[in-house]
Amino acid sequence: MEKERLWSCSYVLVCIASFLTSFSFFLLVPTLPFYLVSELGVEQGMVGALLSCYVVAVLCVRPFAGCVADIFPRKKVYIISYMLFALAFVGYLGITSSVAAFVVLRVFHGFAFGALTTTANTLVIDIMPSSRRGEGLGYYGVMNNLAMASGPMTGLFIISSGNYTLLFIVALVTILIGFTMALVVRAPKKEILPLGKAKPVISADRFFLFAGIPACVAMMAIAVPYGITTSYMAVYAEEVGLTINSGLFFTVMALGLIVSRLHSGKMVDRGYITQIISVGMFIALFGVLGETLLHYVAGYSVVAADILYFLSALLMGYGYGTIFPAFNTLFVNLAPNSRRATANATYLTGWDVGIGIGMLLGGLLSAAGFCYCFAFGLLMLLFALLFFTSYVTRHFNKYRLR
C-alpha cells in the first residue's frame, strides 16, 4: 500500500517557520540570565523568578488559544499570533535599565508565544496525513531541535562581546523571516465549531481536555528537569569550572533529539505510543543523573567532567526526543478531531507548568548550589516514570479514541 504524502509545500513551510520561531526563542534562553545580571543588575537568586513570568503568561494563554483555534480558522489565528510574537522582539530593543519594563515585555511575549505554538502545533497536524502523524510530528520537532542546536550557541557567541542589542536584532530579523513563511502556508478547510452548538459557550472542557489530566501531570513532571537544564546549564558549567563552550551542550543535546525523533515517530505510527514514552523517560533519567553528579565529578577531574557533560546532553536529548512525538500523539488520540487544538493546548500546558517550576525553583535552589536544583529535577523525572508506567498507561488504553 502506497504511503500518503507527507512532504507537501505547506508542511515544509510550517516546519521552516517553526525552526525560525524556535531559533529566535533559543537565542534568548541561555543569554537572558546573563543579561539580567550584567545589564539590569538583578541578583542571581531573583533571575529564576523574573524569567518564570514568561512561562506563567504562556500557561495562562494556552487553554484560551486552544479554544479559539478550535472555533475560528486556524490559519488566521496562526498569523495573528505570529505577528504578536514578532512585535515582542521589537520591545527588547527599547529596554535599557528597567526591570519592570522587562517583566511586562516578557509577559506579553509569553502570551504571544503560547498562542503561536499552540496554533502551529495544531495546524501542522491538520496539514499532515493521519496515517503518518507520528512521523510527521517527529520531523516537525526536528526543526525545533535544529534551532536548539544552533540558537543557544549563536546567542552565547553574540553576547561574548557584551553586545545585547545585536542579539535582539538577530532574533527580530529571524522571526520576521519566519512570519513571511507563515503567510504562504495553505491550511486545509475545517468545519468551524459553532459557538452555541452542543456545549455552553463557557465551559471548562472547552479549554482543557479532562481525559488528558493524568498524562498532563506526567508531562509536567517530565518538563521540570528540561526547564532547569535549558535555563541554568550554561551558568552551572561556569560554576563548576568547565572551560569548554557551554553552548556546545545544547548542540549535543539537539543532536540526540534529532536522531531519536527520526525513528521514534515511525514507531508511534505502528502503535507503540506508551512503550516509546516509557523508554524515553528511562534514557533521559540517566542524562539528568549525569547533570546532578557533574559538580562532584568536576572536583576530581575536569576531563571526566567534560565527558560527563556531553554524555548527559546526549542522553537528555535522545530521551526527550523519543518522548515528544509519542506524548503529542497520545493527547491527540484522547480527543475528537473537533477538539484537536484543545488537546494540544492541554499537552503544552503540562509542559509549560513543568518548565515554569523548573525555572522558578531552579533559580531559588541555585542559591545553595546548582547541583541541588538538578537533583530536584532528577526526582521529578523519576516520579514521572513511575506514575506513567503505573497509572497513565492504563488510563490512556481505557479512554483513547483511536
Q: What is the predicted function of each stretch?
A:
Residues M1-S8, A187-A215:
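Juxtamembrane intracellular "pre-TM" segments in multi-pass secondary transporters
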Residues C60-T96:
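Conserved MFS/SLC helix-loop-helix module at the cytosolic interface between two early adjacent transmembrane helices
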Residues S10-G48, A223-Y236, V240:
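Helix-loop boundary and gating motifs at the non-cytosolic
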Residues K76-V90, Q275-G290:
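Structural signature of the two symmetry-related core transmembrane helices
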Residues R62-P73, S260-Y272:
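Helix-to-loop junctions at the C-terminal end of transmembrane segments
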Residues V173-L193, F387-V392:
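C-terminal membrane-cytosol helix-exit motif in multi-pass small-molecule transporters
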Residues V107-M143:
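Cytoplasmic helix-loop-helix junction between adjacent transmembrane helices
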Residues V55-P63, M148-A149, A254-I258, L262, ...:
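Residue-level signature of mid-helix packing/kink "hotspots" within the transmembrane helices
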